[in-house]
Regions:
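A structural boundary/capping signal
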Residues: 56-409
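Hydrophobic residues embedded in beta-strands of well-ordered beta-sheets
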Residues: 13-14, 46, 257
Length: 409
């Protein structure tokens, strides 16, 4: 990646550098006011990341003490020293084998460098997963920032975006939509305006050309491209509604995810008439289709009978786990078991007792011949529920793993 830096000074002077090398120094007094942005042309194609602007950029927050500690811990992976003339002569004295010896050492250093890169990636992923788990740890649903948690899923795979920028972007979208509300509008009118503004005016829409692309599950890319899956578009709708003081929840139906607004008074109905009357006091939003629908249309989208569906709000933790399961499926289609394992690791960090995800991870470990890890997951399943009818095939696989040399814990 090349580092591009542009500085615009008060006297109209514009300084542009590439990799800290000044390439443009001009004065243009006509450019006053306006906005800072990034212009990307189709030809030639280019990619950008870490776009930032500020009056002054802060210096690195890395503490020397931390650097020393990290390098001390990893010094066995790398070694380097400058060579003087005397050292060079000693190498020359070795003779014709010296070049090959240096080449071999170079390959060793490359391998060590690769090991450090992998370690860095793993540590970064684990830190993000820990942050995601913490974001979902609140017992009160209102305290969970669903958009932040969804953005952290994208952060697992892509570190090169500023998460807070997207939270601010959501705030800005909500403010823009709020400006369209009539002064004395009620919640139902505001929900309809939110639907119209987000999907008709702003152009957010369901992805149809490449539905299973991972970008549709990355909230930062969904917000950039204004295109996504039913669940990611619904999350954006829910979070914008929350910023507009509208109580909208997720509605996780089989095969399709929706958003739902339910009027406060509907919660006070007697149990006998709850199902019949609640439908009259709710608004169901199909974010993928960009429209308001009723229960009959929701049932049609799932292919199930309406009486077989539970129109109950989905907990935020379950919404995040559903996003991760989507990514597990996408990685499976792409024959990417490493990514599958990463997403399953995240699900199990959120819900360690998720038996289906643990069994799925055990099978992936088994296929990858990581037998001890597979055995660890299988033992967890057997010990956590000894009477489960699903245990017999697990015991068969366990015996097979031990015969193949996996160590029992």
């Amino acid at each position: 990646w090349n580092l591009l830096h542009v500085r615009f000074e008060e006297n109209g002077r514009i300084l542009c550098s590439v990799n800290k090398q000044l390439v443009i120094d001009v004065i243009d007094l006509e450019k006053e006011g306006g906005f800072i942005g990034l212009c990307k042309f189709r030809e030639p194609t280019a990619s950008f990341r870490n776009f930032r602007f500020a009056k002054r950029f802060s210096s690195s927050q890395v503490k020397p003490k931390s650097v020393f500690k990290l390098r001390k811990l990893t010094r066995n992976l790398s070694a380097h020293r400058a060579l003087g003339e005397a050292d060079l002569q000693q190498i020359l004295d070795i003779g014709k084998t010296a070049p090959q010896m240096l080449q071999d050492y170079s390959e060793e250093l490359k391998q060590r460098s690769d090991d450090l890169q992998k370690l860095s990636k793993e540590i970064r992923e684990r830190l993000v997963i820990a942050e995601l788990v913490e974001s979902l740890s609140y017992s009160d649903e209102k305290s969970i920032d669903l958009l932040k948690s969804a953005l952290l899923i994208a952060r697992i795979d892509n570190e090169h975006f500023n998460l807070n920028d997207y939270l601010k972007k959501a705030d800005a979208l909500a403010d823009q939509i709020k400006s369209e509300f009539p002064k004395h509008s009620n919640d139902e009118q505001r929900i309809k305006i939110l639907v119209s503004q987000l999907f008709n005016e702003m152009g957010f829409h369901g992805s149809t050309l490449d539905f299973h692309h991972r970008s549709n599950s990355y909230m930062n890319e969904v917000m950039d491209d204004r295109e996504g899956l039913p669940i990611t578009l619904s999350i954006l709708f829910i979070e914008l509604a929350d910023r507009l003081n509208l109580k909208v929840t997720g509605l996780g139906l089989p095969g399709h995810f929706l958003a739902m607004y339910r009027k406060p008074q509907s919660l006070e109905l007697d149990q006998e008439n709850l199902t019949r009357n609640t439908a009259k006091h709710e608004i169901i939003i199909d974010a993928f289709g960009g429209k308001i629908i009723d229960r009959q249309e929701a049932a049609r989208l799932t292919g199930l009978a309406i009486e077989d569906l539970a129109f109950e709000p989905s907990p935020k933790k379950e919404i995040i786990k559903r996003m991760l399961r989507n990514l597990v499926q996408v990685a499976g289609r792409e024959k990417d078991p490493i990514s599958q394992t990463r997403y399953l690791d995240t699900i199990l960090a959120i819900s360690p007792d998720d038996r289906y995800s643990r069994a799925q991870r055990a099978m992936i470990y088994y296929i990858r011949e990581e037998f001890e890890r597979a055995l660890s997951d299988i033992d967890y399943l057997l010990e956590s529920d000894p009477e489960s009818p699903e245990n017999q095939p697990l015991r068969v696989i366990r015996n097979r793993l031990i015969n193949q040399g996996a160590a029992a814990f």
